[in-house]
Amino acid sequence: MEYEALTGTLWDKGTFWVTVAVLIFLAFFGRKIVGAITTMLDQRSAAIQHELDEASRLRAEAEAMLKDAESRREAALAQAKDMLAMAGREAERLAADLLAEAEASARRREQMARERISAAEAAAIAEVRDAAAALAARAAEQILKETIDEAHDRGLIDQAIGGLPAALRQKAA
């Protein structure tokens, strides 16, 4: 039986016609598939770039806020010194309160900006990882398709045919 499966012409084998059908399919739709995948990856890249640009903008905004807070802090210090010259202890207490508030506000804003930047970076990294995982899965599928040969296919088919009577008996029972 195995000898019969290995003899004959190339035209008699099913794997030849499957290969021909796959090649014809790829000839007709290969560019469209590659184009669609390329478009999808370009869109994902643009989205990631947009998020990175947004993160950079937020970082610049945070730095501007920090500079603004520092300038307000310096102004508060100058005001506190003037009040210290006029009112002594009361001005000293007021300056400490303003300084603490400005520093806390600056820290909160800086922390919020850092969290936004970190979240945007994490999202971008996750999207890149997802794209890499999908690409690896497609590559593994292609490798598996290329490594399974005719002898392995015949063995699986013979095994399935051999198991049909037992499966039919179980189904009938």
UniProtKB/Swiss-Prot annotation:
GO terms for cellular component: plasma membrane; proton-transporting ATP synthase complex. One of its GO terms (molecular function) is proton-transporting ATP synthase activity, rotational mechanism. The keyword Transport applies. The chain crosses the membrane at residues 15-37. The keyword 4Fe-4S does not apply. It holds the Pfam family ATP-synt_B. It is a single-pass membrane protein. Keywords: ATP synthesis, Cell inner membrane, Cell membrane, CF(0), Hydrogen ion transport, Ion transport, Membrane, Transmembrane, Transmembrane helix, Transport. It is found in: Cell inner membrane. F(1)F(0) ATP synthase produces ATP from ADP in the presence of a proton or sodium gradient. F-type ATPases consist of two structural domains, F(1) containing the extramembraneous catalytic core and F(0) containing the membrane proton channel, linked together by a central stalk and a peripheral stalk. During catalysis, ATP synthesis in the catalytic domain of F(1) is coupled via a rotary mechanism of the central stalk subunits to proton translocation. Component of the F(0) channel, it forms part of the peripheral stalk, linking F(1) to F(0). Belongs to the ATPase B chain family. F-type ATPases have 2 components, F(1) - the catalytic core - and F(0) - the membrane proton channel. F(1) has five subunits: alpha(3), beta(3), gamma(1), delta(1), epsilon(1). F(0) has three main subunits: a(1), b(2) and c(10-14). The alpha and beta chains form an alternating ring which encloses part of the gamma chain. F(1) is attached to F(0) by a central stalk formed by the gamma and epsilon chains, while a peripheral stalk is formed by the delta and b chains. This is ATP synthase subunit b 1. The gene is atpF1.
